Each structure stands twice: as structure tokens, then as C-alpha cells.
Design a protein with these regions (language model features):
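Non-core capping and flanking segments associated with repeat-based/extracellular domains
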Residues: 1-340
Length: 340
């Protein structure tokens, strides 16, 4: 059965819901995220819940008025709510019936659905609210994180934007486009605390993700990035001064190519035995994007650096206009043994 059918059957009774939870244990173990909102990627590990945020609500309400007879009622977490079967999308079906609600009920509807699913899948699943709108309050719900997409260049009120970021419960992903702006964010901005960040920006200083990032994975695209900034990034990781949680960093430059050996020598890289195949660094992405790849691009490099504070190793690769940096959960001795 499709997930949509399983959910519909689960509303028949409490006993039916219990039976589904028991009979689908193996299937539910493969699910690692529940996404509220737009998620057009082919990802079998995700359950996608149709939930329009404020930027799409007017269109959503209009569609609801035009299709009155298609709606039916379900009891969700003790609340009677109107639903309809979701339209067949171009890429995939949604996995849950589409709720009907007014703008004023948005928070209570999300709360009811979230608690229903939390009881269904448990707290080991990652619950993500996906939105590209920053001027409304995100409800604080247990185990709910937020994924935000925006264009920093068109934001006029930076204080409101910072207030929105600080009011969000947990920032899972930030995806942003920055062009032709000198708007600065505070070094303490919650933007830099997102677990996953993907940026396209002209200048690496606006915002200064390369300097202030505190999350796990970053994919940064700059028009130009000076060699000294790449060197400073690696040295600050080596010293333990910054990037303590970092797992993976990809830095791509469109207008310049860093001199490979000069940068590697400047950061004090070490080299594995050139006669042996170096270990391959790759790990599961925090968030799957349009390329639909569940894992980071492999780093196969003889060059590596060691963090002074805990002897942790990171593979470093510079190829053409890219720097790739992958942190291993291994000490230097453990890392070198991988080649044996």
C-alpha cells in the first residue's frame, strides 16, 4: 500500500492505527524524515505532508472554495478537520491527505497533524517544516526543525529577518541566494547555526558563512574567494578555534582557481603513502537537494590535516575551482590504518 492509503486507513479507529504501527515496523524504520510543505525530490526515506505556508495560502484557500464537494472530515489528535485527496503531482504523490483551513488556523492545524505523526513514527524521525517565507512565526513543536529558502538581496528589513531566525525552534537547512548586496548579519546570527547551508553569493563576506558557520555541512558557491580566506578556514579548523561540528564543506569559485600546492603547503597538510589508495570520505547529506544524491561527493585525496585539540583528521582536496573538506570521525592513527 502507498503511504497515503496507510494514513487514510489509520483514521478508521485507534485499534486500526495500533495495528498499522505494529505491522509496518520494518517499513517505518526506512523513513528518516517527515517534511511539511514543498519537497519535489525523489527520496524514498521521506514522508511528505502537503502544508501550504503563508506565501501560498491565498491560492490554497481559493482552490478550496472551488472544490467544496471534494472534502471529507477526519479526526486528527482530537480535532475534526476537513481534508481532500492531494492532486497527482508531476514528480510524486503527497503521502498525506491535504488539510483545508483558514489562515488563522494554520498553527493549530500544523500542531494537530504534527502530534498525530509524532505518535505514528516516534521521535527518532526528523520532522522538517519547509518554507521560503520569513515574516511569520514558526510554532515551537517537539522535534520540529525548519528549512528556509530565501533571497537575501531582496530583504529590506534585516532586523525582522534576524528576529524570524531567532524565533525558529531549530534551523535544519538554509538555502539562500545573495547577489549585489552588502547587508551584514551579526556573527551571532542563528543563520550560521543551521545544520546544513547552501549559498550562492558574489562575495564571501556578505554573509560571512565561511568564517562563522557552526553547523555540520556547507555547500558554498562564490564568484571569487581569496586564497588567504581558504587558508584561514583550514587553519581555524586545525587549531580547534572554529567549526567544531563540521563534517563536510564544499567551496566552489566561478571566477578564480586557487593555486593547489600553495594553499595546501600554507595550511600544513600531511600526505598518505602515495603507493596506496587513499580512503574515500563520503557521508549522508543532512538534506537532499535537487541533485537527489543522498550522499556527499566522495573525497579521494592523499592530503589531510589533523586537528590539534583531539587529533581528528580531515581530508582536503583542491581540484580546479573547488575545495572539498571532509572530517573523519577518526584519529590520525585510525585514519592511516584504513589504508591497510
Amino acid at each position: 500500500m502507498e503511504m497515503l492509503d496507510i494514513f487514510l486507513v489509520s483514521f478508521l479507529s485507534k485499534n486500526m492505527k495500533k495495528m498499522i504501527k505494529l505491522s509496518q515496523i520494518s517499513r517505518f524504520k526506512t523513513i528518516n524524515r517527515v517534511v511539511y510543505g514543498y519537497y519535489p525530490f525523489q527520496d524514498n526515506r521521506a514522508v511528505v505532508i502537503p502544508f501550504p505556508m503563508a506565501e501560498h495560502l491565498e491560492e490554497f484557500i481559493k482552490r478550496r472554495k472551488e472544490a467544496k464537494n471534494e472534502y471529507f472530515q477526519l479526526n486528527v489528535s482530537g480535532n475534526e478537520m476537513d481534508f481532500r485527496l492531494p492532486d497527482k503531482g508531476k514528480y510524486r504523490l503527497y503521502d498525506f491527505p491535504e488539510a483545508s483551513f483558514d489562515k488563522s488556523d494554520q498553527e493549530s492545524v500544523l500542531k494537530s497533524i504534527h502530534y498525530y505523526l509524532l505518535d505514528f513514527f516516534g521521535d527518532s524521525v526528523d520532522y522538517q517544516l519547509s518554507t521560503n517565507y520569513y515574516a511569520h512565526l514558526i510554532p515551537k513543536l517537539p522535534h520540529l526543525s525548519v528549512c528556509v529558502t530565501f533571497n537575501l538581496s531582496v530583504l529590506h528589513d534585516m532586523k525582522s529577518f534576524e528576529d524570524f531566525l531567532s524565533s525558529t525552534p531549530v534551523l535544519k537547512r538554509i538555502q539562500m541566494h545573495v547577489c549585489g548586496t552588502k547587508k551584514r548579519l551579526s556573527p551571532e546570527s542563528k543563520l550560521y547555526q543551521a545544520e546544513y547551508i547552501r549559498t550562492i553569493q558574489h562575495d564571501p563576506h556578505f554573509p560571512a558563512v565561511l568564517r562563522h558557520f557552526q553547523g555540520r555541512q556547507a555547500f558554498l558557491s562564490f564568484a571569487k574567494c581569496e586564497d588567504l580566506e581558504l587558508i584561514e578556514f583550514v587553519k581555524r579548523w586545525k587549531s580547534g578555534e572554529a567549526f567544531q561540528k563540521l563534517e563536510y564543506m564544499k567551496i566552489k569559485m566561478t571566477d578564480n582557481k586557487p593555486p593547489r600546492y600553495e594553499v595546501l603547503n600554507a595550511v600544513g597538510v600531511k600526505y598518505t603513502d602515495k603507493t596506496k589508495q587513499p580512503p574515500t570520505h563520503t557521508l549522508a547529506k543532512v538534506f537532499i537537494t535537487g541533485d537527489c544524491k543522498p550522499y556527499t561527493d566522495p573525497i579521494i585525496s592523499h592530503s589531510y590535516v589533523v586537528r590539534e585539540s583531539d587529533n581528528r583528521v580531515a581530508s582536503v582536496s583542491i581540484h580546479r575551482n573547488e575545495l572539498n573538506f571532509g572530517v573523519w570521525n577518526k584519529t590520525e592513527d585510525e585514519f592511516l590504518k584504513l589504508m591497510d
